[in-house]
């Protein structure tokens, strides 16, 4: 879901999602999206999932396994989606201002686009959420 959030911002900004810098360019893999997702994985997804487990929102019986892997059951998927959307709407301190996580992602993608447009790496500031 975070992947799709970033992909939509990359496309809206007219960036080429398959040309990245950290992830290997491979046919069918949007390397730029993978690059941009790295900053958000821990502060957004990892922290959310850990909080869900700590609050017993996700329990062992909500997981189903089969020969292809381990998956959330329908009840758990609904809880996860609701929590994810709530997290994206929640505020965070993004540099000097308060934004929702969704707006912060958009801002960070814009900063990356500015670097490309102006060929100036100093326009990109690494993510610092407080």
Predicted features along the sequence, with ranges:
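N-terminal intrinsically disordered, cationic/polar leader segments
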Residues: 1-130
């Amino acid at each position: 879901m975070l992947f799709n959030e970033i992909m939509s911002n990359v496309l809206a900004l007219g960036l080429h999602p398959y040309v990245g810098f950290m992830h290997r360019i491979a046919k069918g893999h949007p390397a730029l999206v993978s690059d941009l997702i790295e900053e958000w994985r821990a502060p957004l997804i990892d922290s959310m999932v850990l909080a869900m487990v700590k609050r017993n929102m996700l329990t062992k019986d909500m997981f189903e396994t089969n020969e292809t892997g381990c998956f959330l059951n329908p009840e758990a998927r609904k809880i996860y989606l609701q929590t994810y959307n709530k997290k994206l709407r929640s505020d965070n301190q993004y540099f000097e201002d308060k934004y929702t996580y969704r707006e912060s992602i958009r801002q960070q993608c814009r900063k990356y686009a500015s670097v490309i447009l102006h060929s100036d790496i100093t326009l990109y500031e690494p993510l610092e959420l407080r």
